[in-house]
Amino acid sequence: MRTSQYLFSTLKETPNDAQVVSHQLMLRAGMIRPLASGMYNWLPTGLRVLKKVENIIREEMNKSGALEVEMPVVQPADLWVESERWEDYGPELLRFKDRGDRPFVLGPTHEEVITDLVRREVSSYKQLPLNLYQIQTKFRDEVRPRFGVMRGREFLMKDAYSFHTSKESLQETYDVMHQTYSNIFTRLGLDFRPVAADTGSIGGSASHEFQVLAQSGEDDVVFSTESDYAANIELAEAIAVGERQAPTAEMTLVDTPNAKTIAELVEQFNLPIEKTVKTLIVKGASEEQPLVALVIRGDHELNEIKAVKCEEVAEPFEFADEAEIKAKIGAGIGSLGPVNMPIPVIIDRSVALMSDFGAGANIDGKHYFNINWERDVALPKIADLRNVVEGDPSPDGKGTLLIKRGIEVGHIFQLGTKYSEAMKATVQGEDGRPQTMIMGCYGIGVTRVVAAAIEQHHDERGIIWPTDAIAPFTVAVVPMNMHKSESVQTFAEDLYKTLRSQGVDVIFDDRKERPGVMFADMELIGVPHMLVIGEKNLENGEIEYKNRRTGEKQMIAKDQLLDFLKGRINQ
């Protein structure tokens, strides 16, 4: 490709509204341009990268035995009513009607459509297992799209769905998909972790996320210092270590009119924060017990995913409001505690080990200090309620936990029969009777992969693609002052034609630009290998080679150039 025949839309300045590095660099490199909130046009440079990522995903999916299909983006609403997600999915589901007043949705995912397709096409257990995938546009009407293509409203996704007659068969395919995803992200050159995760609104029994480690990530990824244990912080088990110490002081009621938060209590009364607890009132799961008190240590954070796993807590999770709390308990939010609490109490494991701790007295402006379990208040139900923190023991007993930020680029689920049961997707079983199909679901955010690669691999000059395989071009031929030197122009033209004939993805910068501008543009878009052709070097029989990834520079003899490149490309 010649730059003179290419839409080379690089920017010198970073747009003000671009917050994360990937968004900034994708705009500056001329990869994308905004169309509307959370929606982007992909320019030639960006699309080249996107297609290369897509092709790697397709190759590995095909190797796994999955079969590619394509389903419409527009879906009839009656499928969503049938699956019982029409009401549950919320405003992210874009709903509209056609000219015949028939309701449709713009697909955020394709569980309903694929289940409908398979129930029509598959009738016998002999046709299973079956794994179908597509690479297709999705639309989710995010309330706050941000970070460029990292969290857009319209995006490209690879979604696969498998169908089975047994849990064992599902597990086999799930394991194959787990390995396939690892192969994909390894080929893409990403530093990633597969982590145990919550199944969320999609449902199911088991789930793993594939997280690319990057400071700009929205998820907290937890992993062990000494084992393969890894989990999303939502699912990571918090282990409490040690034994509860014996009381050393009597419980006392203290006036605390100006201490309505843990921070104020710690500062005003010189209490260690680990000797305080916070009591959070949430909606209960039954009419008899409409409110529940959850108690965690003052320096810990409540994990809402874990909380709703307690049978007493309502799902979806919801905090009680101030009026409800005041009416039931008689005190405001800043003065709550487990002593004399008139509603069910659940405490975190770490709280169960505390002694001589401080908490609200359920009287406005007052706290109890030196509270002890089984002396001042009965020990209530104990559960894992908190987020883990760095240094906690790993749940597998090996090492301690580290926490890093991650970008979720893939997610696999064991769905079970949630959709097939609701939509009556059955096959004839071995015994001749109808059997509900068991499903798996496997997604990769293709557009997000591009952004994640940039977040993980860049410098002050621009993008550094982690592998040649996804760079927009593999080699850049950059002739200096070509339009003033016949020898430079002739050699550059011949080299460009030779590289193209050998199947090298090459960009030839034939613009009438200063060398500095040409170098800056090639570095910005991340071309891994740059060949700089100068008149003086040509006279010496040499070409300058620059490696974008390593920063290496060296002079290469003209007659050795092709062999040299063969040894460097894709390394």
From Swiss-Prot:
Signal peptide segment: none
Pfam families reported for this sequence: HGTP_anticodon, tRNA-synt_2b, tRNA_edit
Gene Ontology cellular-component annotations: cytosol
GO molecular function, one term: aminoacyl-tRNA deacylase activity
Top-level division of the source organism's lineage: Bacteria
The keyword Cell membrane is assigned to this record: no
InterPro entries cross-referenced by the UniProt entry: aa-tRNA-synt_IIb, aa-tRNA-synth_II, aa-tRNA-synth_II/BPL/LPL, Anticodon-bd, Anticodon-bd_dom_sf, Pro-tRNA-ligase_IIa, Pro-tRNA-synth_IIa_bac-type, Pro-tRNA-Synthase_IIa_type1
EC class of the enzyme, as a word: ligase
Protein name: Proline--tRNA ligase
Entry's free-text remark on domains: Consists of three domains: the N-terminal catalytic domain, the editing domain and the C-terminal anticodon-binding domain.
Entry similarity comment: Belongs to the class-II aminoacyl-tRNA synthetase family. ProS type 1 subfamily.
